[in-house]
């Protein structure tokens, strides 16, 4: 059985480390489209990270409500990623991450997994790293 973990992240800059992931949402579905669970969390900024000016300008002009929502119930990246890891491990194996744009979201999620979960996960919790939401037809889901 394949579990598709459809993820969406918001970040305050173009790359992890100098900037922070501010929120992560995911919904897990099987091949038939049955929802298996969902997850969402908002993160406190990384220590010494700073929001990128052009990213913050985009948020304030295009998605101010998303930016405000991301400031609610924030947790540390370590705590948040441990919660995400716990949730992922409840899902049936052969987990495939899906997102759009997949390379951007996967870069952030993988960096946070490697940085905050490497000590407790034996492997990245996705069988296939990712596919882009625009490629769904190719996967026949």
Where are the predicted features?
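Conserved non-catalytic scaffold segment of RNase H-like nuclease domains
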Residues: 2-5, 10-99
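A ubiquitous, low-specificity "background" feature that marks scattered single residues
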Residues: 36, 74, 111, 138-141
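Short alpha-helix plus adjacent loop in nuclease-associated cores
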Residues: 126-141
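Substrate-recognition/cap helix-loop segment adjacent to the acidic, metal-dependent catalytic center
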Residues: 88, 103-130
């Amino acid at each position: 059985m394949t579990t598709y973990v459809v993820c969406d992240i918001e970040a305050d800059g173009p790359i992890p480390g100098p900037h922070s992931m501010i929120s992560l949402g995911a919904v897990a579905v099987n091949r038939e489209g049955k929802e298996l669970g969902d997850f969402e969390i908002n993160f406190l900024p990384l220590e010494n990270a700073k929001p990128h000016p052009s990213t913050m300008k985009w948020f304030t002009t295009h998605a101010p409500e998303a930016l405000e929502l991301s400031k609610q119930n924030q947790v540390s990246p370590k705590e948040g990623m441990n919660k995400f890891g716990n949730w992922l491990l409840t899902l049936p194996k052969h987990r495939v991450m899906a997102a759009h744009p997949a390379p951007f979201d996967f870069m952030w999620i993988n960096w946070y997994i490697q940085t905050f979960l490497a000590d407790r996960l034996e492997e990245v919790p996705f069988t296939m790293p990712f596919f882009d939401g625009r490629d769904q037809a190719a996967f026949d889901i």
